[in-house]
Design a protein with these regions (language model features):
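Alpha-helical transmembrane segments and their juxtamembrane interface "caps"
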Residues: 1-235
């Protein structure tokens, strides 16, 4: 168990205690607010991402900081046309790149479908650049919209609870609230782990950070099996 695992357990414990204290109904509404916030973030993410792409200066700045082609270990492949690279070569290149999740999957899909052909993008290096910056932008926009909607819903829920006070169940209210608190904590962890590919992309391949992730018990679930990251488009 490493620091990431300890942090995960602490977060789950805090959410469990919050659910225990707040009770079933408040915890249920808060969990519902998470789900609504996620759905709205997914719905409006393309609009926000297009807004960023339409700003040339902002988009170029993000392209500069992500610089996906640096993950290609063989410089000869950076300028190679994707049509000249075999599927086995591509598989080896992506495998050796040690890309943050879900970059490898999105790059493979974009190359297979030639997703950026209409923009005149043909080289492997540019496909790495464009795909990684698109995933990067989509994650940022998704998290920003989620945070905004969640904040608004939190004010509404807390205001209603303060004005009328949600009733308690006759039995098991606190325990059910604690269970919902743990579930909400899991959603919160999925959201927090969405920051990991952003950090790894900007900071580069730090061996210490990568080692912590690789040896974490919980990262296999909250990071590599993150259903929210899997929903982030790469184009």
């Amino acid at each position: 168990m490493n620091p990431i695992d300890i942090a995960v357990l602490v977060i789950l414990a805090l959410f469990a205690l919050a659910g225990l204290y707040r009770g079933f109904l408040t915890s249920l509404f808060n969990l519902g607010a998470y789900l609504v916030s996620i759905l709205l973030a997914l719905l409006f993410m393309p609009l926000g991402a297009n807004g960023i792409r339409s700003s040339e200066s902002l988009y170029n700045m993000m392209l500069y900081y992500t610089e996906g082609s640096e993950y290609i270990t063989n410089a000869e492949y950076v300028r190679a046309d994707i049509s000249s690279i075999s599927s086995q070569e591509l598989s080896d290149i992506i495998s050796n790149a040690h890309l943050p999740y879900p970059m490898a999957k999105e790059i493979s899909e974009n190359i297979a479908t030639e997703a950026f052909a209409d923009q005149g993008v043909t080289t492997l290096g540019d496909y790495f650049n464009q795909t990684i910056v698109c995933v990067f932008i989509n994650i940022l926009v998704f998290l920003a919209i989620f945070a905004l909607v969640r904040l608004i819903l939190a004010f509404v829920i807390n205001g209603v609870d303060y004005a009328w006070s949600f009733p308690l169940l006759r039995s098991g209210d606190s325990l059910l609230g604690m269970g919902l608190g743990v579930l909400r904590g899991m959603f919160a962890l999925f959201l927090l782990f969405m920051l990991l590919p952003i950090g790894l992309t900007i900071l580069g391949q730090f061996e210490l950070v990568q080692a912590l992730v690789d040896h974490s018990i919980f990262s296999a679930f909250f990071y590599r099996s993150n259903f929210l990251l899997a929903l982030m488009p790469g184009a």
